[in-house]
Amino acid sequence: MDFSSKLLEQAVDEMSQLPGIGKRTALRLVLHLLKQPEEQTTQLSKALLELRQNIKLCNNCYNISDTELCEICANPSRVSEIVCVVEDIRDVMAIENTGQYRGHYHVLGGKISPMDGIGPSQLTIKPLIEKVQAGKIDEIIFALSSTLEGDTTNFYIFKQLEGTAIKTSTIARGISVGDELEYADEVTLGRSITNRIPFENSMKS
Amino acid sequence: MDFSSKLLEQAVDEMSQLPGIGKRTALRLVLHLLKQPEEQTTQLSKALLELRQNIKLCNNCYNISDTELCEICANPSRVSEIVCVVEDIRDVMAIENTGQYRGHYHVLGGKISPMDGIGPSQLTIKPLIEKVQAGKIDEIIFALSSTLEGDTTNFYIFKQLEGTAIKTSTIARGISVGDELEYADEVTLGRSITNRIPFENSMKS
């Protein structure tokens, strides 16, 4: 694309580096900002800069937080002995929205993925193992997405925990509530039969 | 959505005010920025701010420009007596990409649209009429998109020009090059028959 303005070109170039945003979309977004009051652009720039410069990770669970210890870890009514291992803050938000979990989290910050150059040392696996070795945790719940990378990460952590007396579990895989069996994929349906639960348990909440 | 961080919430709120970007996409973009080097966020913020604060409109054609007179208007090899009326810079870029047009442009900055509260006074119609009255222009080419708003705007300008000796034209509507007649809509096909051109003209470039 040939731009009549260097300023416009720079803004579009920077914008189009965001994932899923091409040059055309970037141009549309930037032209939208030009039509809005200058304040909107100022606030957007300020919010992004402040976030990037001042954001902290919770000292205990490595979730994104404004304080040294995040709200969840600082809440005394939550069970600190149960820890749910997740990939990032989006998973924490999804589980929190269910209202079904009262334990702590441990945010890995990604999954082991040699293809993307992400090894165990780039993730917060070491602090998790240390917490376990310090005897602070009774149970670890693996809640990573069930992809090749997710399974690899689960297995790596599981291996690291060998020799400790900790209880490990993983979230149940099965047919979604409200789904038709007919349209479910074989792997999920197969797992939901193998891991069937006593009927009386399914009537709780 | 409940965020564990006010900074994150603010950034997502500002980001999701852009058109076509919802809360979830905004969160994905913001988390992406957090994973990239701090420099990327700094440059994005800077580029957006500089654009918004320093951008100029060309004194002659009202296109976005870094200088008082844009490159096209300042180019002496272009024909200043023919003016193509377009909606915004994207249309200028599209026509420039064809390499078929050597005249000037006049960027309206929008279309007359009472539904969105945009009247003739918010557009650069007055300066266009003044240029015509000053006798600087021989021909005006209307190149707005053929929607209700585009047609209204064309007609409004056409009416304003009544009494002047200026030649007006509009870009040809018809079947796209390479398209099958079978799948063309009736209005376009009808227009392309009514406005048929001598066959020998169609063989030029």
From Swiss-Prot, chains A, B:
Pfam families: RecR_C, RecR_HhH, RecR_ZnF, Toprim_4. The keyword Metal-binding applies. A zinc finger (C4-type) spans 58-73. Signal peptide: none annotated. It comes from the Bacteria. GO terms for molecular function: DNA binding; zinc ion binding. The keyword Lyase does not apply. GO terms for biological process: DNA recombination; DNA repair. Gene3D superfamilies: 3.30.60.80, 3.40.1360.10, 6.10.250.240, RecR Domain 1. Keywords: DNA damage, DNA recombination, DNA repair, Metal-binding, Zinc, Zinc-finger. Residues 81-176 form the Toprim domain. Belongs to the RecR family. PANTHER family: RECOMBINATION PROTEIN RECR. NCBIfam families: recR (TIGR00615). May play a role in DNA repair. It seems to be involved in an RecBC-independent recombinational process of DNA repair. It may act with RecF and RecO. This is Recombination protein RecR. It comes from Christiangramia forsetii (strain DSM 17595 / CGMCC 1.15422 / KT0803).
